[in-house]
Structures are given as C-alpha cells and as structure tokens.
C-alpha cells in the first residue's frame, strides 16, 4: 500500500546522492557540462571531457584527501565524503596557521571549514531521521501485510504502539528533513531529485497514516 511505497521512496532518498545540485565546487564555478550534487553525507562530481587518466586521478586523490575518483573514458566521476571535506579544510587551516597566518588572512578558509563541518552535522541529522522513518515504515508495512498472509507476529504490538509506529514513519522523515535543512550552511544550491523523493516519501507516509486513522478499513 501507500506505506510500502513510502518505504521504497525513503530508501531511494536516503541512499541517493542528489539532495542538492550546484554549479560550484569549493567556491569555484564549474563548466556547464559538469554536475555537482550533494547527498546527505557526500558530494558527487561528474565532469565530462576532463581528459581523465591515472595521473589525474592520483593527483586529485592526493590533494583532496579521502576523495574517491574513477575514469569513465574522459569523464571524471568523484565522490567525497562531507567528513573528509571538513577534515581537509581543518588541515588547511592548521597549515596556514603554522605559516604564521591567522585571522582575516585565512578567514575564507576558516569559513569554508565551518560550512563543511556544518554540512556534516546536517547530513548526520538528516540520515538519522530518514533511516528512523524508513525502519518504522518497514514495521508499519509489516503490520498491514503479515495479517493478510495469516501471520500474527505483529499482534503483540498494542494499538497505541501501532499508532506511534505509523505516525513515526512520516514524522521522523519530516524531522530529519527539517533538521537537515536548518543546519545546512547558507548557499545557492538547488533542490535535487533526492530531496523531492524524500518529501514524497514523508508525505505518503503521513497521508497513509491519516487515511488509516479516519477511514476504517472495513468501510
């Protein structure tokens, strides 16, 4: 039913890599054909016509610590965990401070570090909320499906518990999305398909529960 669809969409959203899209990487504008997308915990780059080769991959992976890069012909496909980007800027700040630079001299770098680390926290909150919602959506789906198959494994859950599980599926997804949004650093990125899918999963879960509460199944 609707809760099962919410479960599938929730999984697609939490595991997807395109909650936000941008035309910039680390403050630099990318070429028109390049794609920069942000998931909850990592950013992804697809750069066609980049003359990708082993030397390019080695150089980028050495500079951008933690970044995973592969070539598809001339196309560069890169994934960089938000936590690794946070650490990258932190190491950069330490390097500049060791050189005697501080304050306004490295403000751009420290601001970038703050933003990258804030994105890590936002992604963590979003991930917890979405996964919590997905798990409850799975339980809610089983509560509806198993009795149809003659399995009474869920009968031990009291009615109030069933209501909490049903409302919690969409509620936790909503909470995760709200926390993620308000903890994100300011920027000009646009909504990606993953965010739309997450919104659909949350809306369907809440809608399914709302219908179940006010429209009895035998009517």
Question: Where on the chain are the PLM-derived regions?
Answer:
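Signature of small four-pass
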Residues: 1-20, 123-181, 198-216
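Individual transmembrane alpha-helices with interfacial aromatic-anchor signatures
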Residues: 188-200
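Membrane-helix boundary connector in multi-pass membrane proteins
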Residues: 179-190
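Long, glycine/tryptophan/cysteine-rich extracytoplasmic
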Residues: 16-121, 188-189
């Amino acid at each position: 039913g609707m809760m099962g669809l919410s479960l599938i969409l929730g999984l697609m959203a939490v595991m997807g890599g395109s909650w936000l899209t941008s035309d910039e990487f680390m403050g630099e504008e990318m070429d028109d054909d390049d794609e920069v997308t942000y998931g909850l915990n990592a950013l992804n780059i697809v750069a066609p016509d980049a003359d990708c080769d082993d030397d390019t991959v080695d150089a980028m992976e050495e500079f951008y610590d933690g970044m995973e890069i592969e070539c598809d012909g001339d196309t560069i496909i890169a994934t960089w965990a938000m936590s690794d980007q946070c650490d990258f800027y932190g190491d950069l700040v330490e390097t500049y401070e060791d050189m005697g630079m501080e304050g306004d001299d490295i403000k751009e770098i420290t601001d970038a570090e703050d933003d990258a680390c804030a994105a890590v926290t936002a992604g963590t909150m979003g991930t917890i909320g979405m996964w919590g919602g997905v798990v409850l959506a799975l339980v809610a789906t089983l509560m509806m499906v198993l009795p149809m198959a003659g399995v009474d494994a869920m009968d031990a859950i009291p009615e109030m518990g069933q209501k909490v599980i049903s409302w919690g599926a969409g509620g936790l997804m909503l909470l995760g999305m709200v926390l993620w949004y308000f903890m994100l650093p300011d920027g000009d990125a646009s909504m990606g398909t993953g965010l739309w899918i997450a919104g659909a999963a949350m809306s369907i879960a809440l809608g399914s529960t709302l219908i179940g509460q006010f429209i009895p199944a035998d009517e």
